């Protein structure tokens, strides 16, 4: 029998998670936006899950936005903030979900996209970050908390403090690789936006979340029903 050890790439579904999900996979079924009894029960289950995610990450339930995974959450954070242009800084060793999203914005009018250099050890070069922050107004800084391939763990709190010295600058943390392995507290990190993904911490695939702690309007990636 194969032994799976690559838990930095993905994790198996925990038995207790499967047990909690089965009642909703097997029915009865109801749209959580419906006002009848079954609809309200579905809504209650979603809100209970939202509260658990918030508690895990030191946030409030109202700050949790459900997504289809880490990639959508990262795109919503970055494109949602940058849709009208501005200046975006991102770490030079980010996950492709951030790096390619950032690079796609180079075609957007009035948008400047710059990478933040890292040291030989893979850490964000704080002196270079301070210099970049001082050059011109910054709209958003995006940095991953931990790198699943190199094992580098960023000093996210120090980066957050540097970002918040700049008026109106927002700080996005990609915590997909950290949540479930390291303590993640959105307040201690100073993150205005924070991304997590369920399949990295023994949950189902196809589920992620974006935490929004700052009072910022995010331009939606999709348009449709409120649910």
What are these regions (language model features)?
Residues 1-227:
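Pyridoxal 5′-phosphate
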């Amino acid at each position: 029998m194969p032994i799976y050890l690559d838990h930095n790439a993905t994790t198996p579904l925990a038995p207790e998670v499967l047990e909690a999900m089965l009642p909703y996979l097997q029915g009865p079924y109801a749209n959580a936006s419906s006002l009848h009894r079954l609809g309200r029960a579905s809504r209650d289950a979603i809100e209970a899950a939202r509260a658990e995610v918030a508690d895990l990450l030191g946030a409030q339930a109202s700050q949790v936005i459900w997504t289809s995974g880490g990639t959508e959450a990262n795109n919503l954070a970055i494109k949602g903030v940058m849709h009208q242009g501005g200046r975006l800084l991102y770490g030079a060793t980010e996950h492709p979900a951030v790096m390619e999203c950032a690079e796609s914005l180079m075609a957007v009018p009035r948008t400047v996209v710059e990478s933040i250099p890292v040291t030989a050890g893979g850490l964000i070069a704080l002196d270079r970050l301070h210099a970049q922050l001082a050059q011109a107004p910054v709209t958003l800084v995006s940095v991953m908390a931990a790198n699943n391939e190199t094992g580098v763990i960023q000093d996210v709190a120090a980066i957050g403090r540097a970002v918040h010295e700049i008026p109106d600058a927002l700080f996005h943390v990609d915590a997909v690789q950290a949540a479930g392995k390291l303590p993640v507290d959105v307040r201690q990190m100073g993150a205005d936006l924070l991304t997590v993904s369920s399949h990295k911490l023994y949950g189902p695939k196809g589920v992620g979340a974006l935490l929004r702690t700052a009072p910022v309007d995010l331009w939606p990636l999709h348009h449709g029903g409120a649910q």
